[in-house]
């Protein structure tokens, strides 16, 4: 009972969720029962005749069941199809581990349907085990022990199942650089010790088809020789792909399939083939010829994801038997490949039988429930209720660990369609097992109404009644098929009910009857919809104090605009009509530079409230008023002859007043200083002018010329005097130097250039004697 409690809680949660969803229904643009069913899981359709009133749309028929009942629709007339699930149990005596085998679902859009799938782990289920071994030179000791494993492997399988078979295959790597040495001698014997007999390298060789003959296993494996390659990673993924893609060649039965992958190193994967100029992606197909993968140099290595998909598709559970240094690497690989296990292999593979037994027990005690590829319109989730008391809900796949023999576990599968789907099917299976559940999916979008007939009295003899709504014959339209199209298409008639091509018919608020909009009656009290295209109403206007247009005493709403009473104004009739707060001292509204709205000045750009009297940022028109200032004050200038006409708007003030100071030249070049005072209105100024003009006298030409000439002459004379003084000082300095040299001179009678013609030579021997 305790184990069933999570299931009961989940079912209660689902019912509560559906109850919440059933309280909502979006019925916009709904005209048929099918449209209603598609619009939401909480919608229902009332097929009662004459359920809609005058001017009401057919979408009124679509609502939640509670709302339809409250509107007077009898419960028998409410169409509310539900999602359903029908299951067919397996035949008695069948060894199927999954039940049921077939499920038929009728899916309504947005409404989930749930059904249970039970898995019961069978005892002694048949097993096929394929031993795939790395024959690179580093595995030479392992091969010796594997050659003796045939009997031990079969005995181990027979301890688990009544029917076990074993097979064998081997791999090295692609036979191109840089994976193997392509020197002809090295291709014949790739082993480092030339005296040792080795076989040429190869990608994958299928040695023995799955069999229950242990002697044959030992015989065929005993013929195998070690090989070799260059780099550390091996081509194991290539070999695994061929084992999964060639079921007939390998001899797989429709039973539990185990693939033991034995190696002491890593693996190449997609993209590594480019190192050997192999660019074509792996196609995931079988390419065995004479039990050899001869196309390995044409296709790149498979990706891990590609291999995982192929293994799952073929129901193959890999067991990675690897040495201690590679355990962590292959544990990462098992995180990507579902239903796989890793075991630590001894250096000489002595423990491989025990490793396989432990890995099988680990794999068979965990169950993953998954489904085949689905379209985007279908969503499948799983709730797992495991035998160990643990549960998971709303997961992308079912998952239970610690599964025991003959102890059932339950998965609740929930399927939801996002729209009305086409009839289709998919399969659910436990990964690594051959049993499947076939799920057939059909749409649940039609209403089984009772009134489908051609009763002439209902639709005027021009149509049939379907779910309470008339479906008119060709040439007639209208709620009761009362309108004859007279050769016009329905598109043409609908076009006259659209404001423009981008708008919807009758603004979505009316029905197009004979090319004219008949507006709906609104559910909102006192709301009236009107207009040629039903585009207007009497409530969608601005509100003041919580009421449309401030209430009926202030104004009424007409098609989005408030029409105010004579005493009120404003976009929402929020203001009394008054200008008292907008008048300046002279009684001018907003100083003539703005408009009074709601008793507040709305000033022209630049002018400041409250009365629009100042404009700090506006330029002062000093230059523009200079001619009028000159003629008004001094009776001269360009406007002297018609000053009163040209400057009639400008008043000359006799006393100084505060305003904008100006200083401009008059027509004679004199400076005028005056003050502009702005009056009410725009560009209207009074002016006060200072009495005195600032006139600058002309320059003295003679003084300027005389001074210039005199200055040039004086500069020339000064330069000559300086030059003369400098030359005199230089001559004086040279004269004094000459005098000093003269005093130092000593004269005699000898000619310093004369040399005597007589030469005297002394004999050194003569001196000694």
Swiss-Prot record:
Residues 24-74 form the PSI domain. Ca(2+) 1 binds at residues 138, 141-142, 264, 347. It holds the Pfam family EGF_integrin. A motif (Cell attachment site) lies at residues 397-399. Mg(2+) binds at residues 136, 138, 234. Belongs to the integrin beta chain family. Heterodimer of an alpha and a beta subunit. The ITGB2 beta subunit associates with the ITGAL, ITGAM, ITGAX or ITGAD alpha subunits. Found in a complex with CD177 and ITGAM/CD11b. Interacts with FGR. Interacts with COPS5 and RANBP9. Interacts with FLNA (via filamin repeats 4, 9, 12, 17, 19, 21, and 23). Interacts with THBD. This is Integrin beta-2.
